[in-house]
Amino acid sequence: MATQKYRELVTIGGKNVVLAHHEPPVINAGVLENADIFRLINIFSEKFTPSNLDKADGTPLRLYASDRVKVDVSKRRKHDMAFWHRNVDAHEIIFCVKGALKWETEMGTVTMHPGDMLFIPKGIGHRSMLCPDSSDDNVLLELKIADDLAYVGEPK
């Protein structure tokens, strides 16, 4: 019997199942249906330019969408957000990838730097603003998630 070389952990319904592979899982020439779903994109590319790059009333650019989740890229560069936003349909999780922006919310004000993540609950008014640490490239990823979320990531 051949030696197990590769292990795969599959999570189904909160349970983990371990599968043994004798060939690398990356060798999979048989997957053709929905092959376009597996995609690498560079959010710094100029082709992903949202209207909020240089417009105060501009909005982020939608990259992915489903009924329950949306993924946007934001590149606010020149102007503070000219309006307050209140998403009553979804929580918003904001990841700062590059640069820095200040977020005013009904719950308080924070300044985000690369590596920071901000959770804005459904229904909370907010807006982003330039700050002293902002650069010519302030890049954020924004997830809009309609499902209820519970924070489970407390570091040990």
Each language-model region and where it sits:
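Short histidine-centered beta-strand/loop micro-motifs
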Residues: 61-65, 81-88, 105, 129-131
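Short beta-strand His + acidic residue motifs that chelate non-heme Fe in jelly-roll/DSBH
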Residues: 84, 103-104, 120, 126-134, ...
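A short hydrophobic beta-strand segment most commonly corresponding to one strand
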Residues: 119, 134-153
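Short, conserved beta-strand element in jelly-roll/cupin
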Residues: 76, 86-103, 144-146
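A short, N-terminal "cap"/entry segment at the start of jelly-roll beta-barrel domains
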Residues: 1-73, 83-84, 156
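Short acidic-glycine-tyrosine-enriched beta hairpin
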Residues: 106-122
